[in-house]
A protein has these predicted regions:
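Short gly/pro/ser/thr-enriched loop/turn and capping motifs at secondary-structure boundaries
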Residues: 23-24, 35-36, 48-49, 286-288
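Short beta-strand-centered aromatic/proline hotspots
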Residues: 25-30
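Non-ligating segments of multi-cofactor redox enzymes
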Residues: 54, 61-401
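Short conserved beta-strand and strand-loop elements enriched in small hydrophobics
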Residues: 12-22
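Single conserved hydrophobic/aromatic residue that forms the stacking wall/gate
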Residues: 1-6, 11
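Phosphate-backbone binding interfaces of nucleic-acid-interacting proteins
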Residues: 40, 47-56
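Helix N-cap / beta->alpha transition motif
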Residues: 7, 41-42, 100, 148
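Short, solvent-exposed secondary-structure boundary/capping segments
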Residues: 33-45
Length: 401
């Protein structure tokens, strides 16, 4: 939000001037795919009358819009960016499964390889092997969320709507640098790498060298965006380790938080393979340091009264917008009708401009989410862990023709 995006392989401060206007100490973030000898700078920042939340954030790029001659000077110094994601390639893992359009036309399951594991019953996929006593999810509702990686463009609408709907505090760059992010959902971005496992075998490269080169994005990479939130696992690792039963499983397949039970051990966050649980390090709604319209009587009117404001020392996470589900149930009951497909919507799904996110009741066999779950493109993130998430993904299809 307050930097140049550059192509040169370094991160240093810069001075920018067109002879009349000058910006000093502008940090540069190196981004793969940026054309050589070019920089990009976001507009809309550097405001002086936006209020406490927006004043003096970033740099004002508008004075340079009509200039023909621009000088960028490298200066000494470094800048610590507030970036959540520290890894930028998948390093050969199938976190994002993808295929080409040509391959998908030939085989709808292309790119969606499912590993089989040795058991006493023979080779089986992970979701058919279990030591757990199964939940009864065939009766009533079973809420699922589908995410189409082909449609997702990484715009962040879902993150912003989730933030507003669920009273999630904005903690600022200083806290983000300490990995104290509070977003209930994040959008992971991965660049492609020139090094692959197949290429390493051909060139007989050692594993250490292969993975080191896999960390480096291609000069002109392909990019994929992947929204990640609480997966509402049916074999949830977080539920097993909570000593006070603050996180439990509902009979509708949702992983629930009881905030007034939570004592902040953070065992659940440690045990979550998706790293989607957030800890309240401060009483954000009362602390003046985080005064973004939450600390005065007028500002608190912006908070959603249907969602409790969490306290210091409490873990929080995606609730699958349970307040909207409960509101829908009451509405359907008053009207004397069953719940229809698409009646229930999480705010991330309803705000998505590309319809990449689809929410619904899997037990309604006519629902769109039920159809998508049974599609050959559907897969679970980290399916080898067999946590059986209620959030699933659709294989990304690239048109490389």
């Amino acid at each position: 939000q307050d930097s140049l995006v550059g192509s040169e392989m370094c991160i240093r401060d810069r001075n920018i001037t067109d002879g009349e206007n000058i910006l000093e100490n502008v940090p540069v973030m190196i981004t793969p795919g940026q054309a050589q000898n070019t920089v990009g700078m976001a507009v809309g920042y550097g405001r002086t009358r936006a209020g406490k939340a927006g004043d003096n954030v970033g740099f004002n790029a508008y004075p340079f819009l009509n200039t023909k001659e621009l000088t960028i000077t490298k200066i000494e110094g470094e800048y610590e960016f507030a970036s959540i994601q520290l890894h930028h390639t998948m390093m050969g893992r199938d976190i994002v499964k993808e295929t080409s359009l040509a391959e998908y036309i030939k085989d709808p399951s292309a790119g969606n390889h499912r590993e089989l594991y040795h058991t006493y019953k023979g080779k089986l996929p992970a979701n058919e092997v279990s030591l757990y006593e199964e939940h009864d999810l065939e009766t009533g509702h079973f809420w699922n969320l589908s995410i189409d990686l082909t449609s997702c463009i990484g715009c962040g609408e879902c993150v912003i709507s989730c933030q507003a709907e669920n009273n999630i505090p904005v903690v600022g760059k200083e806290e983000m640098r300490k990995s104290r992010d509070m977003h209930w959902m994040r959008i992971d971005r991965y660049f492609s790498s020139d090094m692959t496992k197949e290429l390493s075998k051909e060139e007989k490269i050692s594993a250490i060298t292969m993975y080191s080169e896999m960390e480096v994005p291609s000069e002109n990479p392909e990019v994929v965006f992947q929204p990640v939130m609480c997966m509402h696992c049916n074999h949830a690792p977080c539920e097993n380790v909570c000593p006070v039963a603050a996180t439990t499983h509902s009979n509708e397949g949702l992983n629930q938080m009881t905030y007034n039970r939570c004592i902040g051990t953070r065992y659940c966050a440690n045990n979550c393979p998706y790293k989607v649980r957030r800890f309240n390090w401060f009483q954000y709604s009362e602390n003046e340091k985080f005064d973004f319209h939450m600390n005065d009587d007028l500002g608190k009117m912006v908070l959603n009264p249907d969602v409790v404001v969490r306290s210091r020392g409490v873990i929080e996470k995606c609730s699958m917008c349970i307040q909207k589900i409960q509101e829908l149930k009451l509405t359907a009951k008053r009207e004397g009708r069953p719940i229809r497909d698409k009646d229930a919507q999480t705010v991330c799904a309803s705000s998505c401009s590309t319809n990449a996110l689809v929410f619904g009741d899997f037990n309604n066999k006519e629902s769109e989410v039920s159809r998508l779950r049974n599609d050959e493109r559907a897969y679970d993130l980290l399916d080898h862990l067999n946590v059986r998430p209620s959030v699933f993904y659709q294989t990304k299809i690239r048109n490389k023709a």
